[in-house]
């Protein structure tokens, strides 16, 4: 049986570390002038995928 292919868009969006999956923040692409600097600073930091979504992301990544 051939190897399962990973979803390429998921490979570009997620990074796998020690038992956790990192993701970038949303709401940073446009209409940024009305968003406060504090909010933009907080959105720059990477987040972890929520426990309810981990199984789906792992399936997409082929883990």
UniProtKB/Swiss-Prot annotation:
Signal peptide: none annotated. This is Large ribosomal subunit protein bL35. HAMAP family: Ribosomal_bL35 (MF_00514). GO terms for cellular component: cytosolic large ribosomal subunit. The keyword Cell inner membrane does not apply. GO terms for biological process: translation. Pfam families: Ribosomal_L35p (PF01632). SUPFAM superfamilies: L35p-like. NCBIfam families: rpmI_bact (TIGR00001). One of its GO terms (molecular function) is structural constituent of ribosome. It comes from Campylobacter jejuni subsp. doylei (strain ATCC BAA-1458 / RM4099 / 269.97). The keyword rRNA processing does not apply.
